[in-house]
Structure formats: C-alpha cells, structure tokens
C-alpha cells in the first residue's frame, strides 16, 4: 500500500537511506565486537571496552533515527543482512582505533553520497536532516579518532604496552 504522507521523496533517496541504515548497523556490530574483545581477561583494557560499547550504541541510534525519518517521509524500511565484522581479534588498542577511524571515514563518505542523492532529487528536508544530525558529528568523531591514533603512536604503541595502558586509563577512562 502506498503511503499517504509521501511527498517529494524520491525512490533513490529511500533506497540510499536503507543502505545507510545497513551500514550504521554494521558499524554498531563492529564496535560491539571491539568492545567485548577489549573486555576479555587476556586483553583487559576497560577504557577501550567502554568507548567501543558507547560507539556501538551510538551507531545503532543513528540507524534507528534513519528508520524513524524513513517512516516520517512515507518511505519503506527494507532491512538487509548485516555483514559480520571484518575480524574477530582486534589486536592492540592502536590497531582497533585505526580500524575505527577507517570505519568512521567510510560511514562519512556514505553519508556524503546519501546527501548528494537527496540533493540531486531536490529533497531539502533530507539534506537538512543529514546536515543537522550526522555530518558535523562524523567530522568531529573522525578528528577525535585521528588525534588518538597520533597520540598512541607518539607514546610508542603498539610496541610499548605501557602506552596503551596509560591511554586506556587516562584518556578513555575519564
């Protein structure tokens, strides 16, 4: 049945939103894997575990916000299989943060692509929604992760285990 509320909402935008929902859920799933990796007794970095758990929850919230927007615009949500994370072992804190940085850059590029599709189809509502709720937050997250990668390298990670311990305790543990 066709939506009664659908207005100026192109099928391409609807499909791109569904793809973005899947990517946000994949990011959430990946961060959840990282969180419980760092919670293991043989890794034991609770600051990293807490940070990645929070990131997982945030990415899931992003997916849910897109689903709500899809419904408000009269679109239909078509969930797809969520791909498993690229790995099960995340190595050092530095390795995981580098993976997180790449993941955030991929999510950001996908959001920019979604914005472009919506812009090409003259959908100011969706463009405003993305600009307000996603794009600025992504840039800030990328910058923060980049800074942390730089600081861990400066401290001698991953060769220096004390660097990761102190980073976990003083940067992520606050």
From Swiss-Prot:
GO BP, sorted A to Z: intracellular iron ion homeostasis; iron ion transport; negative regulation of ferroptosis
Keyword Ribonucleoprotein recorded: no
Enzyme class label: oxidoreductase
UniProt GO cellular component terms: cytoplasm
UniProt keywords, alphabetically: Iron, Iron storage, Metal-binding, Oxidoreductase
Gene3D superfamilies (UniProt xref): 1.20.1260.10
EC code: 1.16.3.1
Source superkingdom: Eukaryota
Chemical reaction(s) catalysed: 4 Fe(2+) + O2 + 4 H(+) = 4 Fe(3+) + 2 H2O
One Gene Ontology MF term: ferric iron binding
UniProt binding sites for Fe cation 1: 24, 59, 62
Annotated binding of Fe cation 2, by residue: 59, 104, 138
Domain Ferritin-like diiron residue range list: 7-156
Listed Pfam families: Ferritin
Claim: Iron is one of the keywords in the record: yes
Tissue distribution of the protein: Liver (at protein level).
Subunit comment: In liver, forms a heteromer consisting of middle and heavy subunits. The functional molecule forms a roughly spherical shell with a diameter of 12 nm and contains a central cavity into which the insoluble mineral iron core is deposited.
Biological role: Stores iron in a soluble, non-toxic, readily available form. Important for iron homeostasis. Has ferroxidase activity. Iron is taken up in the ferrous form and deposited as ferric hydroxides after oxidation. Also plays a role in delivery of iron to cells. Mediates iron uptake in capsule cells of the developing kidney. Delivery to lysosomes is mediated by the cargo receptor NCOA4 for autophagic degradation and release of iron.
Recorded family membership: Belongs to the ferritin family.
Designated name of the protein: Ferritin, heavy subunit
Native source species: Trematomus newnesi (Dusky notothen)
Organism taxonomic ancestry: Eukaryota, Metazoa, Chordata, Craniata, Vertebrata
């Amino acid at each position: 049945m066709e939506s009664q509320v659908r207005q100026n909402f192109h099928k391409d935008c609807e499909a791109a939103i569904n793809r973005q929902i899947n990517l946000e859920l994949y990011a959430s799933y990946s961060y959840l894997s990282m969180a419980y990796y760092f919670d293991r007794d043989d890794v034991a970095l609770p600051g990293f575990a807490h940070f990645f758990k929070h990131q997982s929850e945030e990415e899931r919230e992003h997916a849910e916000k897109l689903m709500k927007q899809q419904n408000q615009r009269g679109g239909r949500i078509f969930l797809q299989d969520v791909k498993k994370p690229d790995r099960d072992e995340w190595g050092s804190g530095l390795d995981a943060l580098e993976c997180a940085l790449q993941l955030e850059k991929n999510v950001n590029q996908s959001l920019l692509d979604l914005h472009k599709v919506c812009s090409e189809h003259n959908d100011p509502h969706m463009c405003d929604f993305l600009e307000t709720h996603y794009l600025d937050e992504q840039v800030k997250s990328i910058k923060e992760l980049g800074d942390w990668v730089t600081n861990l390298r400066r401290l001698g990670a991953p060769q220096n285990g004390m660097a990761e311990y102190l980073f976990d305790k003083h940067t992520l543990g606050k």
